């Protein structure tokens, strides 16, 4: 709380990241109102999903339906103040509908938009896959030009293109591109599986795509009135 007060005092834009678990996923209104009461304008909600070796969800893991309901209610709370409050998921969705590349890699066609650098210089393609089999190199030993051209990096990026048959005929495929490989691989260790939160995404898209598409049309029609954001708090 002291950190929030300090950054607000110094007028520093920042994002609050809220992890959704069984302890809070049933309280969307309370959480949203709490953040707004603190004067927070940039929010991000991350669904927690971890599994036992046999594929069963760990106790704190939320269900797709719970995540979908949470975000749909947040959308209703956010919509009246959408011009002054930023919720990352809805920002990314609006970017996709505007034909832009979303800020979140979850909605990208491939997983090659960033890398993770560990304390010792080791580099991995994603913070969910800090694993020996995906290590790309080390900043102390390899140049970035070498690392960026590694076959392993291309192989990882291509994992997202292993679309499940349901994705190929889904009306939202052009938005989520099969979701996050972590959520596809996490339960059964198969990249070609459906994203664990697929049902949630469909619930959210069904709720938000229509209104956001109309909003995007209005904004693009008055582009001269839009103030560009020079710094992303995400």
Ranges and model annotations:
Residues 1-3:
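Domain-scale recognition of functional cores that engage charged ligands
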Residues 5-106, 110, 116, 120, ...:
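Radical SAM enzyme [4Fe-4S]-AdoMet core and its adjacent flexible, acidic
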Residues 130-234:
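Flexible mid-to-C-terminal extensions adjoining Fe-S/redox cofactors in radical SAM and related proteins
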């Amino acid at each position: 709380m002291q950190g929030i007060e300090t950054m607000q005092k110094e007028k520093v834009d920042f994002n609050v990241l809220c992890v959704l678990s069984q302890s809070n996923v049933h309280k969307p209104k309370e959480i949203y109102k709490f953040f707004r009461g603190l004067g927070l304008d940039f929010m991000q909600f991350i669904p927690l999903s971890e599994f036992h070796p046999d594929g069963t969800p760990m106790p704190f893991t939320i269900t797709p339906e719970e995540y979908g309901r949470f975000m749909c209610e947040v959308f209703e709370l956010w919509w009246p103040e959408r011009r002054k409050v930023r919720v990352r998921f809805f920002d990314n969705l609006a970017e996709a509908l505007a034909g832009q590349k979303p800020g979140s890699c979850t909605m990208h066609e491939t997983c090659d938009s960033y890398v993770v650098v560990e304390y010792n210089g080791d580099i991995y393609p994603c913070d969910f896959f800090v694993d020996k089999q995906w290590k790309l190199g080390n900043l102390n030993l390899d140049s970035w030009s070498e690392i960026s051209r590694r076959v392993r990096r291309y192989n990882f990026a291509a994992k997202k293109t292993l679309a499940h048959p349901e994705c190929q005929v889904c009306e939202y495929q052009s938005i989520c591109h099969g979701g996050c490989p972590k959520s596809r691989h996490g339960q059964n260790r198969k990249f070609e599986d459906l994203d664990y939160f697929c049902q949630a995404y469909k619930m959210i898209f069904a709720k938000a795509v229509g209104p956001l598409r109309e909003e995007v049309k209005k904004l693009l029609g008055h582009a001269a009135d839009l103030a560009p954001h020079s710094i992303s708090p995400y």
